[in-house]
Each structure stands twice: as C-alpha cells, then as structure tokens.
C-alpha cells in the first residue's frame, strides 16, 4: 500500500535529515596533536621526530656503518619476547650504546646473542649485563656467551649486575655461581691457558630494597634501580643517565608508583606489556583462561596500564617490549595505550633501532643478513682490555689436555695424514706439557701455524 506523507510530516523528516547531515559534517573533536604540531603532523608525533646527526640511512640501520657522535645514544632491541619462543622474536634484551665507546646490555634472554652478533658487535665487547630479575627469559643466553667469549678474545671476567633476593640463595650472585658450576666441564678445559680468567664472572649484586640506589657509576654513566612488584622480591627496574640523556627499562612487573617517580621525564621509557584479553591471551599461550588471568593480574603490566604509566612519566618517547607481537592485536594494544597517553609511542620489537639526542629521536629497523659471522674487536681493544694496555711478548702456558683427557683416548685419534690432502697438511697445534707462546700470534696479530 502506498503511504502518503503530508507536508508537515515531510518537513519534519527533512529537518531530521538536515540535523543528521550537520552532525556527520561536524569537525572531529577530542583528539589534537599532543605537542601542538601543525596540520599534517599527526596526533601523536612530536616535532623532534627527526633523524639524528649520525643517521646515514633514514630507513634502515646497517651495522658498522654509523659511528655514534659523542652526544648521541642508540638503543637496539636485541630481543622482545617473553614466551613462547618465536622465529621473529628472541628473549628480551636491550642494548644501549653511548657515544663513541660505551655499551651496556639490559637483560639477556634466549636467542638475543644471535641478534647481537648479527649487529656485528664483537663478542669480547659484550659485557656489563644488567638483569632485572632471574626469570630465565631474561638471562638464558648468558651461559652461551660465557662459554664462547673467552674463545673469541675476552680474557677478563664477564661483568653481570643484578638484584639481591629475599635470601642469598635467590640473588644474582648465587645464580652466577651456580652457572659457573654448571659450566665447569667447559671452563676446566682452559686451565693454564691465557683465556682462563675469561670464565670468571664479576658480579655486582645490589640490595634490591635500596630504591633509587646507584648500581653503576663509571665514565659519566650512572644507573639507578628500584623495586618492581613481580612474582617475588628482587625484581628491579633501571634508569640510565648519561650526558644529559636518559633511558629506563622497567623489566617485568605491575604498574607502580616507584616507576612513576624514578622514571619521571626520562627521554626513552621502555616498559613491558601484556594484552588484557584473558581468553585470547590464554589461547595463544596454550594455557587455561584461569592461568592467563592469574599471570596477567599478578605479574604484568596490562596494555591499558602501559599508557597510564607513560602518562605519569611523561617521556619524550614511550615504548613497549617483552610482548608477543601479534599483528592482529597491534590496533588493540595501541588503543589501550592511547586511552591514557597521547604522546609518541612505539613497540620495541627485535631489530628496532632508536637514535636519541637532546633535540631529536629517530626510529628504524636494522637490516640484517640471515647468516652472519663474528666481528673481531680491534687489536688495540684486546690489548687494552686484556692486558691493561701493556701486552707481554710471550707467555708460558700449560697444556690443559693432560689434566682433562686420558692419553689412551687421544691415542685412538686417526692420523690427519690419512685424510688430509698433502698440500693442505699443516703443523697441528699439539701442545706439549708446557710451552711459551707469542701473545700477538695467539690473539691473531701474527700468523697461523704453517703447513
């Protein structure tokens, strides 16, 4: 049936339509650029988001191609995943480079060493590792480094800095002592050799209760720490201050007032993130929703809380790491942050590179090969760090094989002449019970054994 509308009704309908059209055409309200930037600048990007002086390629970071200036900080995320292990994400580790000569590491999770080597950091120079707490996803690659760094030329102890625990048995020192025991089969093989001291660990264990205490103060670099609420006593956060620049890594834990206090106005604020969607999170983790809720609610910082905490801190750049970076959840994670924090925010996922000066910040991704080998430190570095700048010309060493292997099993080795081409036979490095070695040759400054 055809329904006829009178003039009055038609006028009312037209009025409603006009009102709806006017509402649709109203300018957007509520969101403005947090920094007062002009049109075309976005709503969260600051005017200081610009390449820093050392940046040579604005799109990607190519290792060894960009020496840092004396007033610049570079932060590289070498790992960003708590659990489960992923091809795209190693365990949490953040490398901070300061100017021309200083490098520190914050946490050292499983798989991070692969990324550090891919970034062409010489293995002997991987040192000064700060642990936020003693869950394995924050230090599991230390034993791997510990075994091979002396082989690669670090003949002095590995330096590890971390918190005490409620008891001595639960602190960083105890963990490192047990790791040395675990690796005794490896370190024993270096007995009597120049690299033997490289299997020692120099532990700086600070009192975790000393909020605001200084655990590192060298060469103009100061690192302070404070407690975090995460699973057990001992979890800590760090703030690094150097040359007017600053960096915070909270480690794991619930959002807290101490972090808001000690991280205030930091240049780069990095915290962890757990997506507060319990059923989905549990599904992806392979656990029950109960376990999911229990874990998030008691141990971690929800994505909403990341923004809340960042708003209290007011950094120049806020970042989240230690998060499973699921692409379909990027919008949700960002929306949660944006509820409370309107400033510059980014995810610190594997290979993320952040350059920082006092007036600029720039973020890129490192361009790395799938296969990479080890970069060597300079001979000058090895002489300075292994011998204090004065390298001896020769050293007397004892063969470690005599004490570590029964001669009977060595006697069963097949003669190399039976399988090696004649023109490829060389003098095999068979050590007598005691011998003198040329240190320059041993470090690689001389020649390899001749044929």
Predicted features by range, described:
Residues 1-21:
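N-terminal export signals
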Residues 228, 275-276, 391-392:
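Short glycine-rich anion-binding loops that position phosphate/pyrophosphate groups of nucleotides
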Residues 375-404:
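Extended, charge-rich low-complexity interaction segments
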Residues 363-377:
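A polyampholytic, Gly/Pro-enriched intrinsically disordered region
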Residues 237, 243-246, 254-352, 442:
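Cap/insert and terminal regions of metallo-dependent hydrolase folds
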Residues 2, 322, 361-365:
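Short, charged/polar, Gly/Pro-enriched secondary-structure boundary elements
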Residues 6-9, 22-248, 257, 331-361, ...:
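Binuclear metal-dependent hydrolase catalytic cores
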């Amino acid at each position: 049936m055809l329904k006829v509308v009178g003039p009055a009704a038609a006028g009312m309908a037209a009025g409603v339509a006009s009102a709806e059209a006017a509402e649709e055409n109203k300018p957007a309200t509520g969101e403005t650029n947090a920094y007062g930037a002009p049109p075309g600048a976005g709503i969260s990007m600051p005017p200081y988001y610009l390449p820093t002086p050392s940046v040579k390629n604005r799109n990607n970071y190519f290792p060894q191609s960009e020496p840092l200036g004396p007033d610049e900080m570079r932060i590289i995320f070498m790992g960003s995943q708590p659990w489960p292990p992923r091809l795209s994400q190693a365990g949490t580790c953040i490398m901070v480079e300061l100017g021309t000569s200083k490098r520190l590491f914050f946490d050292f999770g499983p798989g991070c060493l692969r990324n550090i080597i891919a970034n062409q950091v010489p293995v002997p120079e991987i040192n000064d590792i700060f642990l936020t707490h003693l869950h394995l996803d924050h230090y599991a690659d230390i034993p791997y480094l510990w075994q091979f760094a002396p082989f690669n030329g670090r003949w002095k102890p590995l330096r590890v800095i971390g918190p005490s625990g409620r008891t001595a048995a639960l602190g960083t020192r105890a963990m490192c002592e047990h790791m040395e025991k675990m690796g005794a089969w490896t370190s024993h093989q270096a007995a009597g050799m120049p690299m033997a001291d490289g299997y020692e660990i120099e532990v700086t264990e600070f009192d975790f209760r000393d909020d605001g205490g200084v655990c590192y103060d060298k060469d103009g670099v100061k690192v302070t720490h404070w407690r975090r609420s995460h699973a057990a006593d001992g979890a800590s956060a760090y703030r690094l201050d150097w040359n007017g620049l600053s960096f915070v890594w909270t480690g794991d834990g619930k959002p807290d007032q101490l972090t808001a206090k000690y991280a205030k106005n930091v240049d780069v604020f990095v915290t962890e993130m757990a997506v507060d969607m319990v059923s989905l999170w549990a599904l992806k983790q392979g656990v029950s929703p109960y376990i999911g809720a229990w874990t998030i609610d008691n141990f971690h910082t929800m994505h909403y809380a990341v923004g809340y905490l960042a708003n209290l801190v007011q950094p120049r750049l806020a970042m989240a790491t230690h998060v499973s970076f699921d692409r379909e959840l990027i919008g949700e994670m960002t929306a949660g942050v944006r509820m409370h924090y309107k400033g510059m925010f980014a995810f610190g996922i594997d290979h993320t590179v952040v350059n920082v000066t006092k007036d600029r910040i720039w973020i890129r991704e490192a361009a790395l090969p799938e296969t990479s080998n080890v970069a060597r430190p300079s001979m000058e570095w090895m002489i300075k760090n292994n011998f204090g700048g004065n390298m001896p010309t020769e050293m007397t060493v004892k063969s470690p094989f005599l004490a570590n292997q029964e001669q009977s099993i060595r006697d069963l080795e097949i003669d190399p002449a039976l399988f090696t081409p004649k023109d490829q036979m060389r003098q095999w490095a068979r050590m007598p019970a005691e011998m003198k070695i040329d240190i320059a040759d041993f470090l690689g400054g001389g020649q390899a054994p001749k044929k």
